[in-house]
Amino acid sequence: MSKSTDELFKNVISHAKEYGFVFQSSEIYDGLSAVYDYGQFGSELKNNIKTYWWKAMVQMHENIVGIDSAIFMHPKTWKASGHVDGFSDPMIDNKDSKKRYRADQLLEDKIAKYDKEGKTDKAEKLQAEMDAALVSEDLPRLKELILEHEIADPVSGTRNWTDVRQFNLMFSTQMGAIAEDADVVYLRPETAQGIFVNYLNVQKSGRMKIPFGIAQIGKAFRNEVIARQFIIRMREFEQMEMQFFVRPGTQKEWFEKWKTTRLKWHLALGTPEEKYRYHEHTKLAHYADAAYDIEFDFPFGFKEVEGIHSRTDFDLSQHQKFSGKKMQYFDPEVDPATEKPYGNYIPYVIETSIGLDRMFLLTMINAFEEEDLSTEEKQDSRTVLKLHPCLAPVKAAIFPLIKKDGLPEKAREIMDALKLDFNLQYEEKDAIGKRYRRQDAIGTPICITVDHQTLEDNTVTIRHRDSMQQERVDAEQLEKILGDLVSWKNLLK
């Protein structure tokens, strides 16, 4: 990271804690590594991101429905999915610092450094060599590349590395009252399997026809050996996933459709298009025949925020094999080639999967601005979160200009009329300018000030967050003004 991007990232983290967005979990006990809590404004922002995704994915599609599956699943589920045997990362230790790293991430950081230095040929060559080693699971070759490119441990500065080894990422625990009789169960490492084992339940109970999708938002858990970069990589995190079931042979068409649709969802929030890019996977997961990531340019480089995968029929076929239950769908549609119904088959699956915590961080970074408002007369600045109004934790703040003359009572009256429909904050402490600054810092789109004129003609002053412009409006219009400002139509139309 350059000094400016490094500073931006540190400032966002500091801001998140200071203003109640994200806290270190169990902080009074010195915290727990890579585990975070969302504060009063963070939980609101997170819920608004979830609502935006759910509306775009479920409410706007007649053939997509939602479920909420359990975190604990039968342990055979994870054997069938391949997670017990194949869910691991290539790790390498530095013998001097005793720190552990993902070998591929060390190499990716080096590739990014070559790119920034203009050494494109070197970057492309290393990328190709790393991809080849990952595809063939050649762990010794990964170590060779680390040594060849003189990659040093960022802590010790030495190149005294162990061999590369694979580490399984699943958390296991026991279910049962007596330890020796207890069954081993896992905290789910992804939410997708809860959808797959329920796909026929949903299809039959909802009379769904192919193509159709099942969406879910939920917690997942991975025993990340290397957890870093704030909430980018955590051991407990939240996913927003949709599995779309299609007729075999149509998966390429649907894959391209969802790839395009999902990027549009991100761009609708107003993020500059150049901040995003597609990244094609060279090493495909055991279940996929095509995979792209939508990556965002974080201060520390491009990182995945959403994956679009063509999972073929792998998961459903595996669950059919391990459970002994038929996972086939009967398709009554007539095949033009044979003039007969398509009949029984196991559907192919297109997956879209977002890391909600990464989406949260992306949103904070995009919105965070430090503005210099100095004039010749005085020095001034403000920190503002220019969040999309639909995502803002607080939709409006209501201030009485002073704490007397009936102004607080009138402000409360206006708040009571609006709070059923909007998340509001009431503030009467400090000068009006300081109150504006506090609301800017949490991303509140408008502030409504009640003054003595309000008592005369029922008008209030609205101050807009981004422009800081003020206008006088009738208090009776506030419900419509706020409703138009934060309507989901602004994002979903």
Please tell me what each predicted stretch does.
Residues 1-493:
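NTP/phosphate- and nucleic-acid-binding module
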